[in-house]
Amino acid sequence: MEIEATTVQKRRSLPTIAMHKQSRTLTKSKPKIRIIHIFAPEIIKTDVANFREIVQNLTGKQDHHHHDLPHQKGLKRNPRSRRSHDHHEVHDMNKSHGFCINSDEEEEGMVSMTWNGNGDESSGGFLNGLGDLDGFIQELGEFPYLPFTIDPAVASSSHLHGNVFAEPHHYA
């Protein structure tokens, strides 16, 4: 009984730990939850005449500098020269917006167009409907427990390594 009495007295004599005057209790913020729908790339086949319209619909950008002026409505254009002009515009768009065009079908009057986004560049408005996809992919490294499996045989051909989208590495 004496032992119990001494321990109680020791506990009472210990000073209580007080908070500093300027300290505050912090509330933990809720984690940011994002639901992002990622669609697989599609190959869109179109003729050269409709290519500009399809690209504008996909990117959400309007054509401001190619509207026909009122005094040009009566003028007829040579369709062959217009086709070569469209051909140059398609290749310029290919370089600036990350579109990949198959040249085999291009000569037949059909254009096959795919979008291959570069990791370092912005999507250029192409993925506006998907939200902040660029930021989402960059933030994947913050989640080390995503359900990705890494098989060395598959990983050498894949761009998905260690829970982050990256360039392929060779395993020794």
UniProtKB/Swiss-Prot annotation:
Region of interest: Disordered: 60-97
Keywords: Nucleus
Motif (VQ): 51-60
Highest taxon, organism lineage: Eukaryota
UniProt feature, compositional bias: Basic and acidic residues: 61-71, 86-95
Chief localization: nucleus
Pfam entry (one): VQ
Coiled-coil intervals, chain numbering: none
Tagged with keyword S-adenosyl-L-methionine: no
Ranges annotated as biased composition (Basic residues): 72-85
Gene Ontology cellular-component annotations: nucleus
Location(s) in or outside the cell: Nucleus
Keyword ATP-binding: no
Role description: May function as positive regulator of plant growth.
Further information: Plants over-expressing VQ17 show stunted growth phenotype.
PANTHER family associated with the record: F16F4.1 PROTEIN-RELATED, VQ MOTIF-CONTAINING PROTEIN 17-RELATED
Designated name of the protein: VQ motif-containing protein 17
Species of the source: Arabidopsis thaliana (Mouse-ear cress)
